[in-house]
């Protein structure tokens, strides 16, 4: 299978459905093999995100995708999980208020994302509150 890097078409097709339900699209991965199209979507909602809601979303999104795409579609929807690696600056905004493990130099430090900004975020530990630039983050994951 070949991984496809531009997922903007998929994002544009599903963003209205997720936005109305207060759900953030964290990640979209697409793979194509001949006439088969495999799509993996990671979604996040801060509260009341049940398995039933995921099942309903799967049905709605799959119908939209099958109506537009010219391939057989295999769809996998999941949530980020409790130890998700934060992969983009955009995710700091999505996970505001959440506890994370952050590596700046060679040590991990635990704290909370208080507020995400354009170039960084406010990180609060037990002893300090500091602005961290996204460019200084080596690793970050939910904790």
Swiss-Prot record:
Statement: the UniProt record of this protein carries the keyword Cytoplasm: yes
Q: What family classification does the UniProt entry report for this protein?
A: Belongs to the RimP family.
Compartments it resides in: Cytoplasm
Q: Which UniProt keywords apply?
A: Cytoplasm, Ribosome biogenesis
Enumerate the Pfam families for this protein. RimP_N
Q: Note the InterPro entries from the entry.
A: Ribosome_maturation_RimP, RimP_C_sf, RimP_N, RimP_N_sf
Q: What is this protein called?
A: Ribosome maturation factor RimP
Please give the function described in this protein's UniProt entry: Required for maturation of 30S ribosomal subunits.
Q: Which GO CC terms are listed, alphabetically?
A: cytosol
* Coiled-coil spans in chain: none
Q: Which GO terms describe its biological process?
A: ribosomal small subunit assembly; translation
Q: Which gene encodes it?
A: rimP
Chief localization: cytoplasm
């Amino acid at each position: 299978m070949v991984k496809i890097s531009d997922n903007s078409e998929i994002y544009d097709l599903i963003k209205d459905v997720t936005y109305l339900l207060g759900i953030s699209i964290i990640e979209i991965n697409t793979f194509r093999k001949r006439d088969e199209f495999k799509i993996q979507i990671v979604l996040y909602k801060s509260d009341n995100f049940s398995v039933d809601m995921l099942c309903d979303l799967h049905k709605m999104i799959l119908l939209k995708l099958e109506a537009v795409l010219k391939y057989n579609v295999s769809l996998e929807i999941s949530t980020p999980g409790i130890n998700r690696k934060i992969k983009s600056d955009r995710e700091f905004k999505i996970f505001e208020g959440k506890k994370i493990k952050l590596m700046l130099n060679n040590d991990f430090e635990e704290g909370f994302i208080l507020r995400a900004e354009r170039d960084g975020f406010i990180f609060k530990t037990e002893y300090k509150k500091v602005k961290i630039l996204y460019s200084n983050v080596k690793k970050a994951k939910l904790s």
